[in-house]
Amino acid sequence: EGFKKLSKACHIDADKKITKKHLVEIGCNYIEFGLKNANTYDLMFGTAVGNFAEYPELLESANSTYENMRLSFSKLASDSDEVIAFKCITLWSMVHGLVGILRKVQVVGDDFDEGVGPISTASVIATNLEDHLDKVLTGLIQS
């Protein structure tokens, strides 16, 4: 159920023209899903399921989000399939990591020293998420 909801929130019609803005939007949707559905997200990406191969429908659902992201990214980059796969994993790990970091920002709120430590920087990212993702995507596409 969780993977289906995430896949729906992050789906791009890869048959249409793909823009960087589309990928920024799905990155934001991914992060928003993780922040709003923390318990489900933790079950999806934690160790509760164990071996996904024992649950083929779950595995297929989990893979569909990545595959759609990879296919969409491939329309923007002129790299080999192998390089695109590596860049897509980098992108996915970044948005996945931001879910955890931004959850901490939500817990801490305004109770941190400005300019000190990762929470300060993460708070800036949280308020400028689209801009941050745009810069990251630009770097991945151009590298």
Regions found by a protein language model. Give the residues of each.
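Short, basic, alpha-helical segments at the C-terminal edge of helix-turn-helix-like DNA-binding modules
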Residues: 1-4
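Hydrophobic alpha-helical connector segments
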Residues: 8-39, 64, 91
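Charged/polar positions within long, soluble alpha-helices
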Residues: 11, 35, 39-42, 74, ...
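Short, flexible helix-adjacent loops and helix caps
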Residues: 11-15, 46-49, 103-107
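Hydrophobic alpha-helical bundle segments that form small-molecule/ligand-binding pockets
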Residues: 12-16, 64-91, 140-143
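Generic structural signal for alpha-helix termini and adjacent loop/cap motifs
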Residues: 36-37, 47, 105, 143
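Short secondary-structure transition hinges
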Residues: 39-68, 113
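Hydrophobic/aromatic-rich alpha-helical bundle segments in the mid-to-C-terminal region
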Residues: 52, 56-59, 74-136
